[in-house]
Amino acid sequence: MSGDVIVTVTLNAALHVAYATGKAADDITPISRPGYRAGGRGVTVARLLHSFGHDVLAAGLAGGASGELIIQDLARSGVPTAFTLIRGESRRFFRFSDPDPGGPALRFSEPGPYITTEELGRFAADYRRLLAGAAAVVLCGSLPDGLPADTYGSLVTYAAEAGVPVILDAGGEELRHAVGHAPDLVVAESNAADAGTGGSGAALIRLGAAAAAIAAGGQVHAVTADGEWTARLEPADAAGPDPVCALARGALVAGLVPGQLLGWSWPDRLRHALALAAGGAGPWTRAPGEADERDGVDLAAYERLLDAVRVEPPARG
């Protein structure tokens, strides 16, 4: 690597397994062959950045047959990987679609693997080697069982020592322990920021983050050294998913990364990120067998939504 690669880290990567169901007969519901897709917010970030032509490397932890399928799916998408292999089985999410159009889908989530101290040590060594060629690191998502709550804090510190900027997407205890290590940008939901730090984006800045982007209620509020901005869609129903939801959070983070690296103005960063997130990119947006296999962005929707994003300083009371 030559110092221009964006490294994404997904420590709790998931394999999304989707089934289409048929009409039940004699208490038996037929299902389709499964569709597999690599998931986890860091994986989504890597996939979307790759779609926009950025050099990316998806790293993290992966194990078992599910881990192999995660790596294979990313390879089919053209996304390079450098996962540290573990003995446990990577978690799986299951989705069973309703046979009636517009009907509800059933979703199930496994708890995921337990990570040993030895496995964490191997990952840390791999991660520090990857930093030598990284333009930025994106740390995303929950931590699997076995990892200490300050794991992200250590990874932020390693990156800072290597001179590599860090974008952190986390919440709760993981965020609370990491923010004092001074990540360059924190992305969080409003409730995750409250749970992790007892406050807002401004609280994250006081605790050590250089900048913070907080998603809530279809809006994104950014607090930075250069000022504060709020981005929203007008009209509010210009697109479906709320950028807070799990499907769109990875897209929101991916939308903020290029501007962080290239020094865009914050209004431009937020416009790009919210338009991308509002498209609802995520592993559940396609059922098995659907035609769109571009593994990325609906560019027409993205360009249309750019014009629907309004960015303004927050109203002063």
Please annotate each region the language model reported.
Residues 184-185, 200-239:
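Conserved phosphate-donor
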Residues 2, 268-317:
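Charged C-terminal helix
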Residues 1-59, 238-242, 309-317:
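Glycine-rich phosphate/adenosyl-contacting loop at the front of the ribokinase-like
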Residues 194-195, 240-270:
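Short, small-residue alpha-helix embedded
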